[in-house]
A protein has these predicted regions:
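Glycine-rich beta-strand-to-loop/alpha-helix junction loops that act as flexible
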Residues: 67-69, 190-195, 220-221
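Conserved N-terminal beta1-alpha1 strand-loop-helix module at the mouth
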Residues: 1-92, 97, 146-154, 169-175, ...
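Charged helix-capping and loop-helix junction motifs
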Residues: 141-146, 172-178, 232-236
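Conserved, mostly hydrophobic/aromatic
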Residues: 203
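Glycine-rich phosphate-binding active-site loops on the catalytic face of alpha/beta enzymes
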Residues: 34-42, 87-98, 120-122, 163-167, ...
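Conserved anion-binding
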Residues: 68-168, 182-185
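Glycine/serine-rich loop-strand microenvironments at binding/catalytic pocket rims
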Residues: 162-192, 245-246
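C-terminal helical cap(s) of enzyme catalytic domains, especially alpha/beta-barrels
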Residues: 56, 79-82, 103-105, 224-247
Length: 247
């Protein structure tokens, strides 16, 4: 069964891989504490995505079905691919998370972790929840972190994904969201956007200090070799050293 293997029950890292060989190398470098993203955006249809995700799942114990740069148009594909494959994790827009939870429940995939994407507003304590296909085109819906977390829980999401963070730019907002999540029994937060080896530590520490039980930062382009397209296993080792120093 697919699952997220959190280091000391606290931290896992969500990363991309060029191919299955790269994914296996990363997973090994992370000592099993990595979740490997497979993006729905690369598939024209759900039917095309399902066998490919199954192929990755057969080789890597922790797969995350992704959208692709938070693209709301991918919400349906991501949810349905996850419902047909039951990966460890699936990424969702805020508005799509309830749909994904229903699709997974209907197919016996309740163990798949679902996140719901909310975005920074510039004001700690408030987030944008209008991250869906239609809602992202209109007037931004700004709500309190408490309202957002309670709504996520009501829709069946397990985690708040905070994107695009812009690295350290949104740290006070991340802290506010993480403390709210912890206070209301949400067990996982996923900071995403502009995270690198340089700022990974402070971002992780911010979440841990907020008291949220589990943290899964998404670290993407900063650890991908531009020449080969591979995520660098040596960078994963460095990230894990930071995790071990903080947890």
């Amino acid at each position: 069964m697919q699952q997220i293997n959190f280091y000391r029950q606290r931290v896992a890292i969500n990363v991309l891989a060029k191919d299955i060989a790269n994914a296996k190398a990363i997973y090994e470098a992370a000592e099993g504490h990595a979740v490997i993203g497979v993006l729905s955006a690369q598939f024209a249809t759900v039917e095309e995505g399902v066998p490919e995700v199954k192929r990755w799942m057969a080789e890597v114990p922790s797969i995350s079905v992704g959208l692709g740069a938070g693209d709301p148009a991918q919400y349906y594909k991501a949810a349905m691919i996850a419902a047909h494959t039951h990966p460890a994790h699936v990424n969702q827009t805020f508005t799509g998370s309830g749909f994904a939870a229903g699709a997974l429940a209907a197919t016996g995939g309740e163990q798949t972790h679902i996140n719901a994407l909310v975005s920074p507003t510039g004001t700690p304590g408030e987030v944008v929840i209008s991250t869906g296909v239609s809602s992202s085109q209109g007037m931004p819906a700004r709500v309190s972190c408490e309202a957002a977390v309670r709504m996520m829980q009501g829709m069946g999401a397990h985690a708040a994904k905070f994107f695009p963070m812009g690295g350290e730019k949104s740290l006070p907002e991340l802290y506010a969201l993480a403390t709210t999540a912890a206070r209301h029994g949400m067990t996982l937060i996923e900071p995403t956007g502009g995270i690198s080896l340089d700022n990974f530590g402070i971002i992780l520490q911010t979440c841990l200090e907020a008291g949220v039980p589990r943290v899964m930062p998404h670290v993407y382009s900063s650890i991908i070799d531009p020449q080969t397209g591979n995520t660098r296993p040596e960078d994963i080792i460095q990230l894990m050293e930071i995790v071990k120093a903080l947890v």
